[in-house]
Amino acid sequence: VPKTTRHHKNFQQGYLVQLKQVLKMKDLNRLHVSVFALHLLLTAMFIYVPSQLINFAEIPLASHGWVYLPLLVISLFFAFPSIILAEKYRKMRGIFLTAIGGIIAGLLVMIFGFESKYILLLGLGLFFIAFNVMEALLPSWLSKAAPIQSKATAMGVNASGQFLGAFCGGILGGQLLILNDTAMGWSILTAIAIVWLLISFGLSQP
């Protein structure tokens, strides 16, 4: 009976090599920061916005679903053409940066017009449109930027950034409620989005 040679692959070592490779790629790191910032802002908003709708828009908590649903549907009508434009005409970087700008614009509207019901809703609408564009673009860009042999590792790091962003957003949203200063609260969220935009300017067209 011929002897067979068995080769044992060190999967842990291979994973660590891939992880180091992924963490050294600047564009991937910017995408990880993006998913972190996006879900931080979203979670903070969902904690912070209900009090704003009650206090300034005079919309009872039980009716908030009827605010979010139309805004979500409207935002999808804007999101789909943006995604097609980004993929078909290779405008992903421009639309990506524009979407972050849309998030900033929505937050700025809420800084200066939070006392008006309709301006507050306009700001929320801008935010949700930009959010849905970003939510669709990020996975697509990640799959293009990640090396073939390290795609799973890159997606794992990105998913960790998403959950960490939601965790930090929950903490931030709670702190904004405790702060009890509406203009300052929106300003803090806007500042985070501006830092995110500045970091994202370094992204290359995929």
Show the residue positions of the predicted features:
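C-terminal membrane-cytosol helix-exit motif in multi-pass small-molecule transporters
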Residues: 1-7, 199-204
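Juxtamembrane intracellular "pre-TM" segments in multi-pass secondary transporters
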Residues: 2-34
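Extracytoplasmic gate region of multi-pass secondary transporters
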Residues: 27-69
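Helix-to-loop junctions at the C-terminal end of transmembrane segments
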Residues: 78-91, 177
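C-terminal transmembrane helical hairpin of 12-TM major facilitator-type secondary transporters
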Residues: 92-138
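A late C-terminal transmembrane helix in Major Facilitator Superfamily
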Residues: 145-180
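A membrane-interface helix-boundary motif in multi-pass transporters
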Residues: 175-193
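Multi-pass alpha-helical transporter architecture, strongest
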Residues: 188-206
